[in-house]
């Protein structure tokens, strides 16, 4: 039986927790959605920079140390979070799929994905909530109508909380009407909007990266972005307090996936999917820390429950704020096609271990991707070709990919000692294989099947010569030759024409 947030508040009252008078009404719910942000905050044990606003928020509520996203890329993760369903259950697993146009270019016939379920904003709106999306990030891999999701959208899309800080997001809502909103913070995508503050020579470099100036620049810049993000979070909290909403708002702060560098964004290592989650709200006692496994689709269920209505039976997320909540014994994450790069990986995370199943071992992790033009990517390839990467770094940057990986996360947080072939861990390997097989069967993992010809063709139209995976060969002939030129492999020069 799934309890509502009101039952949760009643339970807390019985336990003696202090509740404000405003908590008797339906609480507001606000998602502080961080883009491309790794959890390098003080409250999560990082001492390199100071993040006072996020740290203060954590002290005011519950900090979740084992929060995992269902994907390491925005559109798949966000499609899951806004529905409470795994992206693989609703056919939203391929990054930026179901798009009728791309950067202003008409895609013609595309693989439309029409859902039979309602999104979280639609559910909340039907329950009487005023809904808004500050920042306008609507990166969903299914067909939807923004007007049905939100009462208010800012006229100008951006990566900061300016509209919310000005009070515009809730200014025109009904009197005493609760709101459900999302505020999108640019995080790792702030670019030059984040001042260069951090000393690059002092940043920590994980062992799976070569220690170079370019790598240090990438890491240092992300720290700069986190400093600016912390400022933005402070502005959001100040606006809630100024307008009298803070005491009756359930705040859920979390990130969609890790920062942009290799092994993090788009991948299922800890840097890609192990993200921050902080819950603050009426009736929630501050200063709590939990090691419970939480999936990003659980945010969806907790949000719906907060409105006082039952969580739909079809929803795969769990209301982790409910007093009868049963902790998960595992969480699942999935990697499928990202941009033009076709990949198929699944991850099972249990309290102690992580199991990775790499299905496409015919291609390395460093197969052609959108990151190839970056100077740091080109440096990685040069170092690899010159034999200047060590064994630890070659696990990811090498030309081979193991079909299975198993890591003891407590002893090996960087995931560099693969235990999959160690006889001592045969039992754990078998256990995690079974968990994955059962999950695939129960959820009907749509990523287990090849992408449709229409989906491949649409991707080929978008990216042209960058589509080098063999899966594209069966549809390549359907486009004019001028539209798809032979791709040049990264690091290889085109042969000179004979005179």
Question: Where are each of the predicted segments found?
Answer:
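Active-site segment of extracytoplasmic enzymes that catalyze sulfate/phosphate-ester chemistry
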Residues: 31, 38-116, 123, 129, ...
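Polar, surface-exposed loop/tail segments
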Residues: 52, 81, 143-145, 247-249, ...
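C-terminal cap/loop subdomain of S1 sulfatases and analogous C-terminal strand-loop tails that border
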Residues: 307-405, 427
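Active-site His/acidic residue clusters
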Residues: 167-219, 257-267, 280, 423, ...
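Histidine-centered active-site microenvironments of extracellular/periplasmic hydrolases
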Residues: 239-295, 308-316, 333-334, 340, ...
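A long, amphipathic alpha-helix that forms part
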Residues: 203-249, 259, 277, 284, ...
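A short beta-strand-to-alpha-helix junction
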Residues: 47-51, 68-73, 107-118, 217-231, ...
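Long, internal low-complexity/basic segments
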Residues: 23-27, 34, 39, 63, ...
């Amino acid at each position: 039986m799934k309890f509502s947030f009101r039952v949760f508040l009643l339970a807390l009252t019985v336990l003696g927790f202090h509740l404000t008078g405003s908590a008797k009404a339906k609480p507001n719910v606000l998602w502080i959605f961080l883009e491309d942000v790794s959890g390098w905050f003080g409250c999560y044990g990082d001492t390199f920079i100071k993040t006072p606003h996020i740290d203060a928020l954590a002290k005011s509520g519950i900090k979740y140390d084992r929060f995992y996203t269902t994907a390491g890329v925005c559109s798949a993760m966000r499609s899951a979070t806004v529905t409470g369903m795994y992206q693989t259950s609703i056919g939203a697993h391929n990054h930026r799929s179901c798009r009728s146009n791309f950067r202003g270019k008409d895609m013609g016939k595309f693989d439309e994905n029409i859902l039979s379920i309602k999104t979280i904003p639609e559910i909340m709106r039907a329950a009487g909530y005023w809904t808004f999306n500050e920042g306008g990030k609507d990166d969903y891999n299914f067909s939807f109508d923004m007007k049905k999701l939100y009462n208010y959208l800012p006229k100008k899309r951006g990566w900061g909380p300016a509209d919310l800080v000005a009070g515009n997001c809730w200014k025109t809502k009904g009197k005493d009407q609760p709101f459900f909103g999302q505020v999108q913070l640019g995080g790792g995508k702030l670019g030059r909007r984040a001042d260069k503050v951090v000393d690059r020579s002092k940043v920590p470099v994980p062992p799976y990266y070569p220690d170079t100036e370019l790598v240090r620049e990438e890491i240092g810049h992300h720290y700069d972005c986190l400093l600016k993000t912390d400022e933005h979070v402070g502005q959001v909290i100040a606006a809630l307090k100024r307008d009298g909403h803070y005491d009756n708002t359930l705040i859920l702060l979390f990130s969609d996936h890790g920062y942009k560098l290799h092994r993090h964004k788009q991948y299922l290592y800890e840097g890609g999917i192990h993200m921050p989650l902080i819950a603050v709200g009426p009736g929630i006692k501050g200063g709590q820390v939990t090691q419970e496994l939480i999936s990003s689709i659980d945010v969806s269920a907790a949000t719906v429950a907060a409105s006082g209505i039952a969580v739909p039976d079809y929803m795969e997320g769990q209301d982790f704020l409910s007093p009868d909540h049963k902790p998960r014994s595992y969480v699942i994450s999935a990697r499928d096609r990202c941009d033009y790069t076709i990949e198929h990986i699944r991850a099972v995370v249990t309290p102690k271990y992580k199991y990775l199943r790499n299905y496409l071992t015919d291609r390395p992790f460093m197969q052609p991707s959108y990151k190839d033009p970056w100077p740091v990517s080109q440096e990685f390839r040069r170092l690899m070709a010159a034999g200047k990467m060590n064994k630890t770094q070659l696990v990811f940057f090498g030309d081979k990919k193991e079909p299975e990986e198993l890591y003891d996360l407590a002893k090996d947080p960087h995931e560099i000692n693969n235990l999959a072939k160690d006889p001592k861990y045969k039992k754990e390997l078998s256990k995690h294989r079974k968990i994955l097989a059962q999950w695939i069967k129960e959820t009907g993992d749509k990523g287990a099947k090849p992408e449709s010809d229409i989906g491949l063709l649409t991707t080929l139209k978008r990216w042209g010569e960058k589509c080098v995976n063999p899966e594209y060969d069966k549809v390549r002939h359907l486009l004019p030759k001028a539209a798809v030129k032979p791709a040049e492999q990264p690091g290889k020069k085109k042969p000179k024409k004979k005179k």
